[in-house]
């Protein structure tokens, strides 16, 4: 898996804006007025909450973020705007003097939350027209829309936001709230957690039931995809015309799940905004969720942390391996959404043309597998005197290349059996083939939804020419 350049992402987040306030202090006695602790406040902190936390996650990834929502004409709104400016988030706040900015005040002592005080009026009764007008003006410049619903009223007219996004050709991702999912009809992707999903479709006892009920929900709501986040059980991606993708959780230690859903939808949106396929975006979001649940409190994930997670996910052994070993290695990589590329050849005398070709092949995916003809196979194909280099030498040379992940030998005249067993996402062959049907293994790859690519060889480089030059002195 390759980490995208999130700085190229531009995402519009719409939802319920909140200010999170914390008062920290010691509690060493009980009040004489009532049986409650007395907290001596020693410090305070303000943080961006609600839909703003999605925007904060996107900004932490390095993306460009526009945030749209309601706030009051009060001190809390001013504090929220200051925090958003510091985070590099472009805020488009519709000020409403008649309501208070949603504020959640938490009193914390010795890392324990003693009480939470909520200040809110809700926005459902407000005229949505000004907000919808601002939304439409922002749509043109954005790549992906995120609707973050906390059921406070900002998305009371969520249908209008979805319809406008679809007309503009913008993917719209929704983090839903409540049991009325019909409000989100026509969205590109919904990201409910398992509890939210089961509240709508009923309890699910296994993956098969999640898939069955999820597909029915997608059909009913005209969704392009559904991602159910399942805590310690990972997440499940469902699409109408593809098999279910069940990804295991990556978190080794779970300290706090606060805000994990915000992290998931922000990484999804950023990856899609830079053109990554949905399966890649989900794999990245799953990695990010595993990172963020290992942190205390509402947190975000940086590109550096994702890069470390991706690197740590690499198979422990690269290089020359057997087909059976390779098939075992590929299982978790497929679950993580990695794109597998396969090519094949004799590679008798490795030259710059080979190196360039293999680099081109690797660029088509996340992992490159090279299938190499055994010595007898080369002899039958090339004639007496070949190969010049025996199989172990050829495999060692290929395995030393940075572009190559694994090298597997085959003894037959063609690698069709190996290609069919691997089922790569991309089968690559070099040369002047007029039609991909002439390429061995093309049928297996196409039947499993893969693609076949033909790459040009670099002119002026040929193993045969090198051998002739050596023989001619």
From Swiss-Prot:
Entry's NCBIfam families? cyt_tran_rel, PRK11316.1, rfaE_dom_I, rfaE_dom_II
Cite the annotated pathway: Nucleotide-sugar biosynthesis; ADP-L-glycero-beta-D-manno-heptose biosynthesis; ADP-L-glycero-beta-D-manno-heptose from D-glycero-beta-D-manno-heptose 7-phosphate: step 1/4; Nucleotide-sugar biosynthesis; ADP-L-glycero-beta-D-manno-heptose biosynthesis; ADP-L-glycero-beta-D-manno-heptose from D-glycero-beta-D-manno-heptose 7-phosphate: step 3/4
Q: Which Pfam families does its entry note?
A: CTP_transf_like, PfkB
- Detail which positions bind ATP: 193-196
Q: Which residues form a coiled coil?
A: none
- Describe its partners and assembly state: Homodimer.
Matching PANTHER family: BIFUNCTIONAL PROTEIN HLDE (PTHR46969:SF1)
A Gene Ontology term for the protein's cellular component: cytosol
Q: Does the keyword Nucleotide-binding apply?
A: yes
Instruction: Give the protein's biological function.
Output: Catalyzes the ADP transfer from ATP to D-glycero-beta-D-manno-heptose 1-phosphate, yielding ADP-D-glycero-beta-D-manno-heptose.
The catalytic activity, as recorded, is:
D-glycero-beta-D-manno-heptose 7-phosphate + ATP = D-glycero-beta-D-manno-heptose 1,7-bisphosphate + ADP + H(+); D-glycero-beta-D-manno-heptose 1-phosphate + ATP + H(+) = ADP-D-glycero-beta-D-manno-heptose + diphosphate
Protein family (similarity comment) = In the N-terminal section; belongs to the carbohydrate kinase PfkB family. In the C-terminal section; belongs to the cytidylyltransferase family.
Q: Where is this region: Cytidylyltransferase?
A: 342-473
The record's GO molecular-function terms, alphabetically, read:
ATP binding; heptose 7-phosphate kinase activity; heptose-1-phosphate adenylyltransferase activity; phosphotransferase activity, alcohol group as acceptor
Q: Which HAMAP family match?
A: HldE (MF_01603)
Region annotated Ribokinase sits at 1-316
Its top-level enzyme class, in one word, is: transferase
Species source reads Methylococcus capsulatus (strain ATCC 33009 / NCIMB 11132 / Bath)
**SUPFAM superfamilies linked to this entry:** Nucleotidylyl transferase, Ribokinase-like
Supply the name of the protein: Bifunctional protein HldE
Q: What is its EC number?
A: 2.7.1.167, 2.7.7.70
Keywords, ordered alphabetically: ATP-binding, Carbohydrate metabolism, Kinase, Multifunctional enzyme, Nucleotide-binding, Nucleotidyltransferase, Transferase
The alphabetized list of GO BP terms reads:
ADP-L-glycero-beta-D-manno-heptose biosynthetic process
